[in-house]
Amino acid sequence: IQAEKQKLIKAGKIKKEKPLPAITDDEKPFEIPETWKWVYVDDICINLQYGTSKKSSTNGKMPVLRMNNIQNGRIIYDNLVYSSDDEDISKYSLNTDDLLFNRTNSKELVGKVAIYKSDMPAIFAGYLVRITPMIISGDYLNYVMQTKYYWNYCQYVRSDAISQSNINAQKLKRFKVPLPPLAEQKRIVAKLEEILPLCDKLK
């Protein structure tokens, strides 16, 4: 992981930052197989980027995804707003398998996440944070961030104001992810994508 990050730092793709302390045995949330390891979100992502703060409109060149477009781990293209700002379009255009994290919302919904699959070109708004996965399947990370374990973390670290709650990027970086080998991540994703539609039909 660290070797891969060093390559990206040398290439100028990410900035060098002080690494988080190693996860001790006492800090591990639960038992995982020997071939897996505990990592922080910060260890497995290229960067965490806040979205545009510029005003959007009902018409424009490109959709601006907002927190209402994140539902059940997927992007929903309803009630879209748009931007024609070329600088923002260049800076905030989403790439396949980027994850969007909702940093500000009600206390029940703050922290919700969805994966972007290039259904249509889009950028993202300021209440969202882009997570760019590295050495991890974006789909696997997205499924981890739909679990009760993840939601318990969000409820624990959120900061509450009068009408909304917030989880900043520093708290997101410290979320601990159970990381299997990449081939196993892909098998887990394939199995979930096989059985979850069946579960939905039973509801």
Identify the function of each model-found stretch.
Residues 1-20:
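Extended, domain-scale alpha-helical bundle/helix-rich regions
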Residues 22-50, 182-190, 195-203:
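Non-catalytic DNA-recognition/assembly elements of restriction-modification systems
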Residues 131, 141, 145, 185-188:
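Interdomain signal-transducing alpha-helices
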Residues 17-23, 54-61, 156-158:
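Short coil/turn segments at secondary-structure boundaries
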Residues 70-82, 99-124, 139-143, 151-158, ...:
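Short, ligand-facing micro-motifs at secondary-structure edges
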Residues 121-129, 139, 159-179:
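A short glycine-rich beta-alpha junction/loop motif
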Residues 23-27, 42-54, 68-98:
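Sequence-specific dsDNA recognition surfaces
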